[in-house]
Amino acid sequence: YYEGKFWSEMPDLNLDCEAVRAEFDEITSFWMDLGVDGFRMDGAKEYFSDNTTENVEVLKWFNDMVKAKDENSYIVAEVWTDRETYAKYLESGIDSVFNFDFGDGDGIIANAVKGSSESGAKGYANVCGKMDELLSQYNENYIDAPFYTNHDMARGAGYYSGEYKAAQIKTCLLY
């Protein structure tokens, strides 16, 4: 028997186990020796299901271990939850958390382009400023990681029902 949060064929890792952490160390060394200079930490909210404190500790350990090998490495975590919670993950010292408020069909980018929420460029800039204030409380050196869509969401162009210009604008808002 093992715990499989996402799928019965995908066992969860026991991140309290020193042997598992040692394996992480070896795996990161392997990839970094090949030139990899960053890591995406998938499903970080579920390392210890919905236990932000323990999850932040794991990310801090991972961040410290990776940055000891190369201080310029980049680490981003996927923490699909509300902004107040995912902001706390930056306390771990990682560089970024994916900014889920920006993604999806009702996200900040889509709503700004559609003019349906804090419409237009001024509203978008206002939201970006508020997000910066929140995230920098937890890590003043964070790098924002907004995105429009990902592999767990519908494709972005479909949010506009054939509005080609709107699809172009939303992509520009990421830069």
Regions flagged by a language model, labelled:
Residues 1-34, 44:
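Active-site-adjacent "subsite" loops/lids of carbohydrate-active enzymes
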Residues 37:
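Short acidic/polar active-site loop segments enriched in Thr and Asp
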Residues 168:
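Conserved interdomain hinge at the start of the Helicase C-terminal
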Residues 148:
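Short, acidic, Ser/Thr-enriched surface-loop or helix-capping motifs
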